[in-house]
Amino acid sequence: MLFSAQQLTMFGVPANPEIAFHIFHDESGTYVPGAGDRWLLHGVLFVPEAKRGEVFAALQDVRQKTGYNEEVHHQKLRQSVTGLKARCATGWLRFYFGQFSDFCFYHCLAVDTHSPDFQHDRFGERHHAYNRFARMAIEGAIAWSLKPYARVALKFHSDVKSRKEGDNFAEYIPSEVCLSIDEKRKKKPAAYPEIRLLHPEVILVESDPSVVMSDLREECECVQLVDLMTGSIGQALTGRSGQRAKIALAEIVGGWIEDTRQPPWLQSEDLHRRFSVSCFPNEQGHFYNPALATTSKDQLSLFDALEED
């Protein structure tokens, strides 16, 4: 994909320099027509290449301080909120909010498969739905968080999955995202940045740090962070798990979600265009803001959990 010629300033410096981002993707929920989970979530984290080392060092610092060196996986969190795993997970979320969100942008697309407007017949295979919604999440994130950038270069990463023969996820996502953004730019050129691919396929990354290849250690940590954030959003939406550690993390991200639902001038967490969750479709086929399970009185609060542990 080619860019137009760069415009230079009077000092010979590009007026709109290209910014390179790594996109990390993971999902929560399983799609099975007529069964499976109600909510399918696809989360994506945009990490600037220039900041990737800083992000990795900060995540490693939390590991060192908590003494936890195993995989940080939302599904494996249990009751204890003061154990090493939960403390590391909480530390990662706090670091994202307090530091990473200044330059790392996260977006989650939450798809309600029980909505009357959800069109099951559009997807002949389960992976068709998976790939389609992953693509939608990435395009939504580009439109919302990368709009201020004129030119970006992208490299895609996702957690390793067992994929059915014929599933072209690794090739489909980069090419279709770029084609779609190009078409949208023809209609609204100021709404999207120009895009160049740094790698033609999604790089599949093992999320277990004990087995990941040494040259993908930084990517491994970021994939785990996306899993943690996306799983916590799923818990905030559904309240499905009674595990105290998951409830505690859901309260954290639930607060971010509620704040970003306010008009920008009323938000207090400074996450506008940095952290976002989009839910769809409602009965009219539109995006909407469903009530969060974390606002239910039946949910165990973070402070109660800490006192009981």
Regions of interest found by a model, annotated:
Residues 1-309:
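Phosphate-ester processing/binding pockets and catalytic centers
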